[in-house]
Amino acid sequence: MYKKSKKEIKNIRVNILKKTYEANSSHIGSCYSVVEILYALYFLKLKKKDTFILSKGHAALAQYCTLFEKKILSKASLDSYGKNNTNLMAHVSHKVKGVEFSTGSLGHGLPYAVGKALGEKINKSKSKIYVLISDGELNEGTTWESLLFASFHKLDNLFIIIDYNKIQSLDFVKNVLKIEPLKQKLTSFNCNVSQIDGHNINQIIKSLKSKKNNKPNIIIANT
């Protein structure tokens, strides 16, 4: 594992727990399932010209705690989580420093990311667009429409990470709407698909480097 990562990841997890307890509000399971993914992006991958969208906005606290560990958010700002008149609520807001796009209602982050990726490609920019979605968002029609669009326009500057924790708010994913065989379905959309351990930093970074020309990149992160 990368140097310092264990300590920083632990700090992020501890702060998620602390703020959940203090505010009595958080989707803590959804937050914990993406910690290593957020760490890999913010600490090891994202460049200034790149864009990250957290489509599963209910994992807002994980993003806030990562931004704090990265020293983008102040302690005073993080301490305001869940309090009156704060911008740091249980669903992510673009009013928070370091956040690109407000999300919460599932299925909206990926369409935005696809549009952003198309715009960057038209402008011949070298920037990359990263979007983290939940497996529950695979129940949304907008997700599959966006994948069709991204594939048609050959958006190889787009990296879609699926937090495959296999559970939704009310039940396991397989009991709500079966999405398997997931990798085969996504590959059939002419996407570059890999499947990894979503808590393994080395696997996350390796998969983010596995880019193919003219194909959107999808990482199924088992968490």
Name what the model sees in each region:
Residues 1-4:
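Non-catalytic, mobile gating and regulatory segments of ester bond hydrolases
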Residues 14, 18, 36-39, 184, ...:
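A broad, structural surface signal
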Residues 9-25, 163-165:
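N-terminal capping segment at the start of a domain
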